[in-house]
Amino acid sequence: MSKQPRKQRKYIYEAPLHARRKMMSANLSRELREEYGRRSLPLRKGDKVEILRGDFRGHEGKVEKVDLKRYRVYVEGATIQKVDGTTVYFPLHPSNLRIVDLNLDDEKRIKILERKG
């Protein structure tokens, strides 16, 4: 892997979906960190997150959508009003989020947590 910033940016821009998923990780809360023995996890629809930066700082809500193409996450309650009056989710970068509660509906995800613990 290159050290050159331009090549780093190029990799992020052209990354395949399986690599983008890993890049869409957020830190775990202290309690979850102690429970699972790891620092971060890729975000998933249904996870409860806390917003750490920006206009919605301090807000907690469920992840409604993870957009791998744009590297953005949409959180329930973090919405803005468009000029025409419609309400849309505000796109948030995963680095500005902290996972407070995990969505453990998926068996594979549970196995991942057990494996790393």
Swiss-Prot record:
Gene Ontology BP, a term: translation
Gene Ontology terms: cellular component: large ribosomal subunit
Keyword rRNA-binding on entry: yes
Sections of the chain in a coiled coil: none
UniProt KW keywords: Ribonucleoprotein, Ribosomal protein, RNA-binding, rRNA-binding
Pfam family, one: KOW
Subunit text: Part of the 50S ribosomal subunit.
Family: Belongs to the universal ribosomal protein uL24 family.
Name of the protein: Large ribosomal subunit protein uL24
Species assigned in the record: Methanothermobacter thermautotrophicus (strain ATCC 29096 / DSM 1053 / JCM 10044 / NBRC 100330 / Delta H) (Methanobacterium thermoautotrophicum)
Gene giving rise to this polypeptide: rpl24
